Amino acid sequence: MSENTFPGRLGINPFGPESRAANTEKPSTSHIVRVTERDEDKVNPTFNNKPLKKFAGDRATNTPLQAFKLGASDGFPEHYGMGRRTSVSAESLNPNPTASSNESWTPPYHRKTPEQLERLKKSISGNFLFNHLDDEQSAQVLGALVEKPIPVKDIKVISQGDQGDFFYVVEKGSFDVYVNPAGSVQPGLGGLGNKVATIEPGGSFGELALMYNAPRAATVISAEGSCTLWSLDRITFRRILMDSTFKCRRLYESFLEEVTLLSTLTKYERSKIADALVTLKYPAGTTIKEGDVGEEFYLLESGEAEAFKAGCQNAVKCYSKGDYFGELALLNDAPRAASVVSKTEVKVAKLGKDGFQRLLGPVESIMRRTKYEGVEEIDREFPGSAAAL
């Protein structure tokens, strides 16, 4: 249909299906690398299979190695105890890590120029770990991040099997990810393992070791020179990002309790949906266009939106807080046959197709019975389209 059929900001369609990388070695920059965590009790070797430069990242030190050597009179061999522990269990994995912590804690702050802040905001704008942060939390994260220039290729930023102390966001350049099935870097050729992905600007890595207090699950190496990373330390990561995730889940659960469609679900079922939702904000006039492939289901958290059909200038349905749309296109595996335009700035909770099919099975029959007043009349007048929002 013509792009001029509906009101709103035509041509802008953030609700459309997300792009998917054709090459598995070059994933979308919005994806975070996820690798299965390995056995914590593996000993961390210090060998690698190619000459990699030193990166002053996790537990870096400028102290000469000789300063750590013990004399013969100590009764210990040289370098005794120099290996890094990889099985650490002292840190709490409470889903709300700040619940019992010192309330006087304040996040670190590193002054940045306006130009640095703009670059950093752009780098994290598409990262899902930061999507649910409020303005105060976002400001804390921006203040705590530290710029880490990576001047040349083949600098090893993190090593599989090591204990992790930092989370990294890529601003510039690319980084290759290697995984060794043994669970850690091994000596000799091929010791890094297999290359499984490349992280590009906007991507991030290192969160798994901090979230689960486990060894690094992969080795990440700069794939080119003149790269730029931003690092966030373990404590700040856990206190801000993990605590905000916990709070976000609680907010979602409260919101889902108010959604009539989900009233028949158990608390456990709603909690699983809450974990899968992603919050997005859009300005007034943003459009989900008729004819798009349906890949997402939306719950309206705040704001107002309207549905339009081809050939009709008047809205056929209005949406407000607690309403939902996008379900029929997923239920019927059909293109969207109506356009939804945000009347005001809106905040929506998005659920992908896989999560929709897996988690909303118990209410499928209710969604199929949903009647869209006014849509049926439009369909009778324009029989070429079905009422699948």
Curated annotation (Swiss-Prot):
Stored Gene3D superfamilies: Jelly Rolls (2.60.120.10)
CDD domains: CAP_ED (cd00038)
GO CC, any one term: nucleus
Biased composition annotated in UniProt, kind: Polar residues: 21-31, 87-105
UniProt superkingdom: Eukaryota
Record: residues binding 3',5'-cyclic AMP 2: 261-377
Keywords: cAMP, cAMP-binding, Nucleotide-binding, Phosphoprotein, Repeat
Compositional bias of kind Basic and acidic residues: 34-43
Positions of region (Disordered): 1-57, 87-110
Region (Dimerization and phosphorylation): 1-128
InterPro entries named in the record: cAMP-dep_PK_reg_su-like, cAMP_dep_PK_reg_su, cNMP-bd_CS, cNMP-bd_dom, cNMP-bd_dom_sf, RmlC-like_jellyroll
Modified residues annotated as Phosphoserine in this record: 87
GO-annotated molecular function: cAMP binding; cAMP-dependent protein kinase inhibitor activity; protein kinase A catalytic subunit binding
Positions of 3',5'-cyclic AMP 1 binding: 129-258
Family: Belongs to the cAMP-dependent kinase regulatory chain family.
Cited PANTHER family: CAMP-DEPENDENT PROTEIN KINASE REGULATORY CHAIN (PTHR11635), CAMP-DEPENDENT PROTEIN KINASE TYPE I REGULATORY SUBUNIT-RELATED (PTHR11635:SF152)
Subunit structure: Tetramer, composed of 2 regulatory (R) and 2 catalytic (C) subunits. In the presence of cAMP it dissociates into 2 active monomeric C subunits and an R dimer.
Protein name listed in UniProt: cAMP-dependent protein kinase regulatory subunit
Taxonomic path: Eukaryota, Fungi, Dikarya, Ascomycota, Pezizomycotina
